[in-house]
Amino acid sequence: MASVNSRSGFCNSNSTFYSKRTPIPLPPNPSLDVTTFISSQAHRGRIAFIDASTGQNLTFTELWRAVESVADCLSEIGIRKGHVVLLLSPNSILFPVVCLSVMSLGAIITTTNPLNTSNEIAKQIKDSNPVLAFTTSQLLPKISAAAKKLPIVLMDEERVDSVGDVRRLVEMMKKEPSGNRVKERVDQDDTATLLYSSGTTGMSKGVISSHRNLIAMVQTIVNRFGSDDGEQRFICTVPMFHIYGLAAFATGLLAYGSTIIVLSKFEMHEMMSAIGKYQATSLPLVPPILVAMVNGADQIKAKYDLSSMHTVLCGGAPLSKEVTEGFAEKYPTVKILQGYGLTESTGIGASTDTVEESRRYGTAGKLSASMEGRIVDPVTGQILGPKQTGELWLKGPSIMKGYFSNEEATSSTLDSEGWLRTGDLCYIDEDGFIFVVDRLKELIKYKGYQVAPAELEALLLTHPEITDAAVIPFPDKEVGQFPMAYVVRKTGSSLSEKTIMEFVAKQVAPYKRIRKVAFVSSIPKNPSGKILRKDLIKIATSNSKL
């Protein structure tokens, strides 16, 4: 490949950008699951997880013993390779135990958001058909309402008035492995996780990731952080049910002995206190939290001990020059590293790995190790070169196998050569830095959560006084974007903004709520009936500046 440009990584002969990072080593053994791969990595780490609120911890020895015991119990109750197991839980030090145990058997883990309603959970259960669910006492009613007969394992020890098939995780963890379990052969190509992501068409779809995808992701994380000297302690506030949380905290960082300090949910005071209390070195977060840290820097530094912290890892959206410089000014000893990835790419895609790279303001970073990129004109399909804007396509060992039971969505997102259409409009500059210009996908990014406009539009149209509706992302400094609705009322209706917002709020998770409504006489559409969201976004943002 002599024609690859040494700066940009661009190859003229096939119009492909190649990563400038050291390629990741992938294990040659085809029969290997991600749990075995992680547990076999040599490191000097002692404590794997700490519960930030109680101080309870799991050492690496205890973690792997627990994983083995739980896997044994699951095997005894009939969980086999290819079975799907649902996990509905806030962050906890036991979340990774469940994931690693399930995957070690060749069974498939599917996670869901604790904020989801019973109806939303029921949809995922219907689609993924789990044979067992892990959850907490508090969240049990949601699963019971969604699937009455699903066997349950409770992850806490609270008493529940429950009929039916309920076990306790703590009892499973105490059990001595029998040694009689016949281990099924698990291949790298077998499915490990089924995480739900809103794709280009808007409705939530199950992303099939293989053990190889996860091993590639683990190796990318180890390559990126594993060479640092000294003990690394990561704060985990990002949700573990999400690819960012699952990739880094339930799997990736364990491979080289990091300690993970787990917060059950994000709360600024708890997070800042935990940094000092547990001497955390690294803080992964999403842009709105970083902005809050800049805005409240004086009070934060006066109140909390942040002396141990040396790195902030930011994902979800690129950071502006103002935010990056503002953070550097307020926290001069802390470096910011950024990352870009999708559920469909197992959270891997691009990153900035040094302070120098992070000074390329607005970038999503350089292509991750062993990743290839293309910029494709979304209209003509022509493959473009450096500094030309088009849809970013990615190819590499962490790209998903496809969408679960959805060939149409798979073929429109993955081409026959394994290229993933990201749905992001980007360009790659002469030094190989990726810049995200816009989202071809119409997803709304609220505080790092994905909200599909199509889902909210379908819900609005069930209201008897609404004849048409469109939902768009409305820009907001605090949360990134929030859902705004354009509504056409039935003739004679005096339906108010408040009533519409309450109507939706009752039926969706809090992050999906509509936070602004405008009434119009008609929704602009193209000849094929597709909503012209760009036109509505222009109207909304120009009106907000008046």
From Swiss-Prot:
List of residues binding ATP: S197, S198, G199, T200, T201, K205, Q338, G339, T343, D424, R439, K530
Motif interval(s): Microbody targeting signal: 544-546
Pfam families cross-referenced by the UniProt entry: AMP-binding (PF00501), AMP-binding_C (PF13193)
Catalysis: reaction(s): (9S,13S,15Z)-12-oxophyto-10,15-dienoate + ATP + CoA = (10Z,15Z)-12-oxophytodienoyl-CoA + AMP + diphosphate; (1S,2S)-OPC-8 + ATP + CoA = OPC8-CoA + AMP + diphosphate; hexadecanoate + ATP + CoA = hexadecanoyl-CoA + AMP + diphosphate; (9Z)-octadecenoate + ATP + CoA = (9Z)-octadecenoyl-CoA + AMP + diphosphate
Enzyme Commission no: 6.2.1.-
Expression tissues: Expressed at low levels in seedlings, cotyledons, leaves, hypocotyls and roots.
Binding of CoA, residues: K265, K447, G448
Effect of K530N: Lossed enzymatic activity
Phenotype upon loss of function: No obvious phenotype in growth, root and flower development, fertility, reproduction and morphology. Reduced jasmonic acid (JA) accumulation after wounding.
One GO CC term on file: peroxisome
One GO BP annotation of this record: response to jasmonic acid
UniProt keyword Ribosomal protein present: no
Gene3D superfamilies: 3.30.300.30, N-terminal domain of ligase-like (3.40.50.12780)
Comment block on domains: Both substrate-binding domains (SBD1 and SBD2) are involved in the substrate recognition, and are sufficient to confer the substrate specificity.
Protein name: Peroxisomal OPC-8:0-CoA ligase 1
Gene that this polypeptide is encoded by: 4CLL5
